[in-house]
Every structure is written in structure tokens, then in C-alpha cells.
């Protein structure tokens, strides 16, 4: 649901739908979700990211449920989010997220989304995959490290390290 410059999403909403809804509403800042498979809840749990943007960057409010079934409302700045993790969401389950966008011409947003898609097609495998598998160490990306080890194209049975991007299997 769009309210002004905010997009209110249930945890089960697909990320592609989030980016498309934001685009149609003229809200920039959520374009990077377009190519990430999965839903809002999972993206927040792992602080999913792409194109140098992260799930917690446009987030302003989060509603969760704890193990006792109690509902909690959080301001995003009160929730710790790190590279590929959100410690709170190990103990709580995300129910709803409120993202804030920046007003922008939907055509400009569409162009940014198209640019992201093009970059993905050039740098990531197009065929079905399990996605990016490993967290990046601090000094070098996991894909670069795997590539430098000469493992691009290596396989066990039908599982193969992508020849396009070594962090994809």
C-alpha cells in the first residue's frame, strides 16, 4: 500500500512487486529490489542487497512478532542491521515493513531498473541457480576469491560453480 512517500508491505510481498509498486507511485530508492528473488521478510532477515543498496536503507518502520506471539513496532534506526544479517530477526519474525522512497519521475525509475537488469545480465548467470552462495570476506569478494582459486566451472554432479560469476552455483 502506498501512503505519500511510503510503501507499506507485508513480509510475504515479493521484492519485484515492491520495486514495481514504488516505480508506479513515483518513489525512487527501491529499484535495487527488482532483481532480488524472494520476499520482504527474508530480505530484511538477511539485509539483502544489490547494486550497493541494502534492505535496511529505505526502511523506516518494522513490525515483528516474538516467540511468545507478542507484536513489536520498531523504528528502523533502533534495529541493528549488518552485512547479510539482522540479529533481531533471529528471534523475531518480520510481519510488516514501511519503506520510504524519494519522489521521482517513474520513467527515470524505470530506466534505473532497466540499467540494473542489464548489469545483472552482464555479470550474473541467466540460467537457474541457487544464487549468490557465500558472504563476502572483508578484503576480497567471495566470487573473486573463488575465481582466483581457479574454480569457475568446477562441478560435483549437476551442481556447478558458474562460469559467469564464481559466487553463483
Tell what function each PLM region has.
Residues 1-2, 59-62, 159-161:
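Generic structural motif
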Residues 1-40:
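Anion-binding (especially nucleotide phosphate/pyrophosphate-binding) glycine-rich loop
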Residues 2-4, 44, 92-96:
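Acidic/polar active-site rim loop that often engages polyanionic ligands
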Residues 4-6, 10, 14-16, 60-77:
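Short, conserved aromatic-histidine micro-motifs
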Residues 13, 36-43, 50, 132, ...:
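Gly/Ser/Thr-rich helix-start
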Residues 16-19, 39-47, 52-54, 71-74, ...:
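Short, well-ordered, mixed-charge alpha-helical segments that flank or form enzyme active sites
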Residues 25-60, 66:
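A gly/ser-rich beta-alpha-beta helix-loop segment of oxidoreductase catalytic cores
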Residues 65-169:
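Phosphate/pyrophosphate- and phosphate-bearing ligand-binding catalytic cores of soluble enzymes
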